[in-house]
From Swiss-Prot:
It is found in: Cytoplasm. Keywords: Cytoplasm, Elongation factor, Protein biosynthesis. GO terms for molecular function: translation elongation factor activity. Involved in peptide bond synthesis. Stimulates efficient translation and peptide-bond synthesis on native or reconstituted 70S ribosomes in vitro. Probably functions indirectly by altering the affinity of the ribosome for aminoacyl-tRNA, thus increasing their reactivity as acceptors for peptidyl transferase. This is Elongation factor P. Its main location: cytoplasm. GO terms for biological process: peptide biosynthetic process. Pathway: Protein biosynthesis; polypeptide chain elongation. Belongs to the elongation factor P family. It comes from Mycoplasma pneumoniae (strain ATCC 29342 / M129 / Subtype 1). The keyword Transferase does not apply. CDD domains: S1_EF-P_repeat_1. Gene3D superfamilies: 2.30.30.30, Nucleic acid-binding proteins.
Amino acid sequence: MADMIEAKSLRSGQTIFGPNKEILLVLENTFNKTAMRQGIVKTKVKNLRTGAIVWIEFTGDKLEQVIIDKKKMTFLYKDGANYVFMDQQDYSQIEIPEKQLEWEKNFITEDSEVTIISYQSEILGVNLPELVPIEVEFAEEAVQGNTANMARKRARLVSGYELDVPQFIRTGDKIVISTIDGSYRERYNK
């Protein structure tokens, strides 16, 4: 039997089983106690199977913690509708369907290091580093005279993701991108 935890003791980053045995990652947790009632715990969670983010209320509940496995792997290649990753320790490979990587695929390139999250043998998702360097496949030409504060132009990365970048970025440059919101952070210097 897995460890049980009181709802009011939940912390960001913990994983629990939800009311319908879904695997939930705790994002935020607030505990409100009034004089005449039992405390209410409002918890913002992400369903690791569906990706849905919702608020759930608990009242004095004991919840079952879920022990998830995290394994560092390297992206090798895309095979049709699947992304293939390899464990650098034992060279085992796994395939993850593209539909399970809707956001993450924008930042995965050859040799990208990721953390695969699983429960028992079920792949739940991929964690990316917060910032990743990635090459610009195409950048629009800078418009001469357009030097207003924070002038931007469109660019497409080698992954196919499009975003706004500063005017000085050119095709072939490597830039650092936030995997949280997909925004440009800086020119990659290495």
